[in-house]
Amino acid sequence: MTMPEAADPIADLGPGAWPDARAAARLEWLCTNGLGGYACGTVSGLLQRRWHGLLVAATDPPAGRTMLVPKVELLVTVDGRTWALTANEWAGGGVDAPGLGHLVRFHMAGSVVVRHWRVGAVLLEERVAMARGRNASAVLLTLRRSRSPVTVQVKCLVNRRPHDHLSRPDDFRCTIAGARGGLRVGFDGHGGEGSEVFLQADGATGRADGTWYRDYLLPVERALGYDCIDASVCAGTLELSLKPGESRGFTASTRSEAPGEAGRVIAANLRRSRKLVEAAGATGDHFRSRLALSADQFLVQRTLPDGRRGASVIAGYPWFADWSRDALISLPGLLLSTGRAPEAAELLRSLAAFEKDGLLPNRFPAPGE
């Protein structure tokens, strides 16, 4: 697949921006899927908030969200030696961030998160994005520079909790089985969207685990005076091989994905980002490009009273729902100044569908109410 050219990098950062693990943990990113689901985290991968995760699925869109995949961790083997590109903080154990010394660049290519990892003479590029309109996150790994093939292990952590809660060991039970190119995790006692998650990589073999990883410390939650210890299950590890110049993708999804899907998700995000920047008349203007792309993250779909899909606006990530008051206040900035007048009209029509006696509800009813 030929990857579309990205717009100029946004928020292009190097190691000078993160002199230590604490500094790297203060730099956060966000990707969304247009349903209310999201992926968010820190530059280094260090979890700081209960909301940080690779796949936070909109299981009851747009406001009902479930943490399914808090993170995946990369381990790279070169010439028989393995390096962990990881960062964790444990209750009572401090910060363990061996990967930070290998992170040489972080930037946003449109709405795509891009990291460059250097391990000796090896340069590995990692791209992260969400599929539009469904609950799937994609990671595309490209071996940009190496004298020989390398092996990458993708260690997959799963959870099953409302995104504003935390888990304790044995809070949920799951069944782990093989799937094409990876693993299928079924969450016992749950049905519908989010009852299972597929962890798959191109050309990979999967090894199931099931071990509980306890005592993830979330420092921002602690600073705010909230519960701050989380626990997740290691579903297992996917192992793949990369040749110099080769790309292979990984997906975390609520459905089984076809081979090559991660690359298609990344490419679609790059194309969409370019179109959004062009529509806003912001090509070449980094500040306005960032505003146009950030504005897009707040726009979601909502089911209307007659069952049709309409438009709405999330009042803020990661914890707010969609509110009509905030939608009307933000409409000029989100949609008119960004060249998206037809979508502004759709938003107004969607809000009007909830009108009663000349009034609009600030909060929307749940399905069936």
Stretches with model-predicted labels:
Residues 1-369:
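Acidic, mature catalytic/reactive cores of soluble proteins
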